[in-house]
């Protein structure tokens, strides 16, 4: 009798510093993820400032046989630098460089855990996302080494929703030097940007130049040396950009899957939108 294909072992992981109402929606969406072809474990780095959030995370891993790592266990911090400076309000999220690279350190510990425990891949997710139940199965089905699930964000109130993926540099939604129509370079950039954004609204799997926040990463990528460490001669802001540059330099392509967009609770006023999913 022919044996069925063995299930892949995926670690679902996140460094968590989140308000309790948002965290509740995130965790509930993890519970309903389909797992037809995969087995999953949970790993969270508890970086919460709210006791209610830490308690909620602890209850979740108890019920779902997950693991929590405390920040103290993975970072050497003195009291003056503990937690770092990060705030958010209805206007947006505000990061200082020290906090960005602190989070990079937490993510690197997750990657190390994946390699040490021989998982096939890690699904690294930000804790303010609400996932469609098919998300993980869809990402695995692409068979890509690095693939993000699309989500959209209004970075400023009332602004246009924008994706968490891009094509070049820090957040360029066009490819410099590519001519798609007659006219100026600026005209071509505008047209390319619109074409790219429209593409992301159609179900598919597309190659991109940068991604983050909701990403399936295969273990062989990590074993090749891809991390969130800062690249000293690159000034781009954000650990995801340094991850992507390092991945591309080591020969790994980056993809985004747009079949099941996640919902981003970027501000508390967007919390009611979860009910409309």
Regions found by a protein language model. Give the residues of each.
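Short, well-formed alpha-helical segments that are part of the catalytic scaffolds
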Residues: 19-33, 55-56
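Short beta-strand/loop segment that forms part of the nucleotide-sugar
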Residues: 39-49, 71-78
């Amino acid at each position: 009798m022919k044996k069925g294909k063995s299930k892949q072992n995926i670690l679902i992981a996140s460094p968590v510093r989140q308000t309790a109402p948002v965290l509740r929606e995130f965790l509930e969406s993890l519970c309903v993820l389909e797992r037809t072809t995969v087995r999953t474990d949970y790993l969270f780095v508890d970086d919460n400032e709210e006791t209610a959030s830490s308690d909620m995370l602890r209850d979740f891993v108890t019920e779902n046989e997950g693991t929590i790592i405390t920040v103290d266990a993975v970072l050497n911090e003195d009291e003056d630098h503990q937690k770092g400076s990060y705030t958010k309000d209805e206007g947006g999220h505000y990061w200082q460089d020290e906090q960005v690279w602190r989070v990079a350190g937490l993510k690197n510990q997750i990657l190390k855990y994946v390699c040490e425990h021989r998982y096939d891949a890690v699904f690294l997710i930000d804790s303010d996302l609400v996932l469609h139940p098919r998300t993980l199965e869809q990402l695995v089905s692409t068979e890509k080494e690095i693939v993000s699930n699309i989500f959209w964000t209004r970075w400023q109130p009332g602004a246009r929703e924008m994706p968490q993926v891009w094509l070049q540099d820090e957040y360029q939604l066009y490819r410099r030097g590519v001519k798609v129509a007659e006219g100026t370079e600026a005209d071509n950039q505008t047209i390319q940007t619109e074409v790219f954004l429209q593409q992301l609204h159609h179900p598919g799997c597309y190659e991109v130049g940068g991604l983050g926040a909701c990403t399936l990463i295969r273990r062989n990528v990590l074993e090749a040396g891809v991390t969130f460490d800062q690249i000293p001669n690159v000034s781009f802001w954000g650990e995801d950009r340094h991850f992507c540059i390092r991945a591309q330099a080591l020969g790994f392509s980056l993809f985004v899957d747009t079949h099941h967009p996640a919902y981003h609770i970027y501000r508390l006023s967007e919390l009611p939108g979860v009910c409309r999913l």
